[in-house]
Amino acid sequence: MLTIYDIAKKAGVSASTVSKVLNGRPGVGKKTIEKVKQITEELGYYPNSIARGLATKKSKTVGVFFEDHLNSGFRHPFLQDILASFKDVIGAHGYDLIFFTNNHPDNHVETFEARARHRNVDGLFLMGIPRTDKNLDAIIASNIPCISIDLDLCGPRANYICSDNIGGAASAVEYFISKGHKKIACITDFFATKPGEDRLVGYLRAMEKHGLSLKKEWIARSDFSDQGGLLSTRKLLDSDPSLTAIFCAGDMMALGAMRAIKEKGLAVGKDISIIGFDNISLLSYVTPSLTTVSQKKEAMGEMAAKELIKLMEDPYYRADPITIETELIIRDTVCNLVENS
């Protein structure tokens, strides 16, 4: 069996030098690096990642936990964009990804921490995990470097990244109000997620700021699916036909809301105005084009990777939560009641 000692003998260097080259560690000259790599390729030597991990106490892998309430898996457009940019940055630093399934038979008996340690990952990336998950305290206490998206996970080796969900939601409601809307409903989520709760807060703050009356039946809770938006909008319009606008905490909700409005024989953007949240790529196929709050998904993925690398590679790094600004994208689903009055 070919070993690094065989490489070292042929290259005329020590085994430790070969190890440094193969693991990308400093302290080796450029010519020696090129020579070792050339001989490695000639002999067809492939380092054993498990053995290397035992020697360095690093597996160069990152575990990804994703809890999917809607069973859409990695097909969800918001998730796709974040994961793509996260993978690019983490991969460029020599790390591979391990995806932990959320329907594994051991899920009910093994914690996130236990599964992460079993796979010997260097860090964790969490998405879609609700604040109420009983495993989160153990993850924070474990000191396994961890970064999360839209989950306020804080600890010595844990940090999180989120969009300005409160500000983004408030900007959507402010835009409705600037167009003369006063009877504005909100569809948020019932999963106790940070984005859902924060977007509801933004809606409430904007309504209160402008002294608008608010009926409890104007707030509907749903999941983040188009079906959830459809059912919620049906209830909203049945309970109060005088509503003129609906803010949806997610674009998929908004697409369902648009369908419900059309079912009522009403026109989206004329009879009832809609604003979503996310700016998913699917919107380019929707008519009328949806006004929405855009999240910088690629930037979130890149920042998550960079923060996790710091947490994994610098034991003294102490991170602060990162909030990324949003942008209201104005399209065709909000009518101007001021002009029509």
Role assignments for model-derived ranges:
Residues 1-60, 340:
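N-terminal helix-turn-helix DNA-binding module of bacterial transcription factors
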Residues 2, 57, 61-174, 178, ...:
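Alpha-helical recognition/docking segments in bacterial nutrient-uptake
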Residues 10, 42, 85-94, 141-148, ...:
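Bacterial carbohydrate/catabolite-sensing allosteric modules
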Residues 32, 75-78, 135-138, 196-199, ...:
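Residues at alpha-helix caps and immediate loop-helix transition turns in enzyme cores, especially N-
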Residues 42-48, 105-109, 129, 258:
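Short gly/ser/thr-rich secondary-structure transition/capping motifs
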